[in-house]
């Protein structure tokens, strides 16, 4: 079934009205000029409201042109006001196999340090190896008082590292293996010489990576296992948590995934609840990288008890201390 895009924005509706209203006021149409204006108005309506596979025609055209303009991967923009620090999570010492998402989410505002987002990312390979990271993105503007209290030079990176170490300590106290992770310990999603196509990133004829936005709704606890069950060389899944605007108690969530396969991705989503990032794979995969400071697309208010209903896979023992033999080199 062809998915329906979101409700048209004000700009799109305004442009359509600018084309339709003059034609409607000219009724009845009698001259050739009137019919030309009618045809132009019809073309504008189709061009702005028409869609295919959940994307407006104008979005398809814009993304197609963006692919042509991009000659290499988008580099993460350098910034001194945002930083992301990572904590790797290993298997628990006890029999529990449920990652404590509600506990992790409380580190959005902990010990006087407020995180813009917390993201849990897992990478699962075809051999069953699972690795999990928790990323805390800290923004200087949200933490000026805490930063100035530590030093006059605003030590953003050091402050974020403090939050990461405290989270790792907390996880170890309740029985999980955990520790801070260096950026170069994270395997790359995409090879530097990959080429973007409409359906994904192509490295070789047997190496494709496709990005998908995941609907963060009440069905998410069923969607994530369905993604993990899909055959793939690598499966990347990320869940991002943030505070709702103006609130310190309500959460918004967003989710995304990427599948590395040895066949060309199909034109439709492989699992219900996924939206292919057609023509937008480079920006989507750049944001999906655990080291990214960008937010994932699609933040929505978290359904009630969502975090308690989500089952996150348990990493395998020693995975985070193993050499990255299969990691793709980065630029």
Swiss-Prot record:
Instruction: Tell me what topology the record assigns in the membrane.
Output: Multi-pass membrane protein
Pfam family, any one: EccE
What are the protein's UniProt keywords? Cell inner membrane, Cell membrane, Membrane, Transmembrane, Transmembrane helix, Transport
Q: Which cysteines are joined by disulfide bonds?
A: none
Q: Does the keyword Membrane apply?
A: yes
CC annotations in GO: plasma membrane
Residues that span the membrane, as ranges: 11-31, 37-57
Q: Where in the cell is it found?
A: Cell inner membrane
Q: How does it assemble?
A: Part of the ESX-3 / type VII secretion system (T7SS), which is composed of cytosolic and membrane components. The ESX-3 membrane complex is composed of EccB3, EccC3, EccD3 and EccE3.
Q: What does this protein do?
A: Part of the ESX-3 specialized secretion system, which is important for iron and zinc uptake or homeostasis.
Give the UniProt family note: Belongs to the EccE family.
Task: Identify this protein by name.
Answer: ESX-3 secretion system protein EccE3
The species is: Mycobacterium tuberculosis (strain CDC 1551 / Oshkosh)
Originating gene:
eccE3
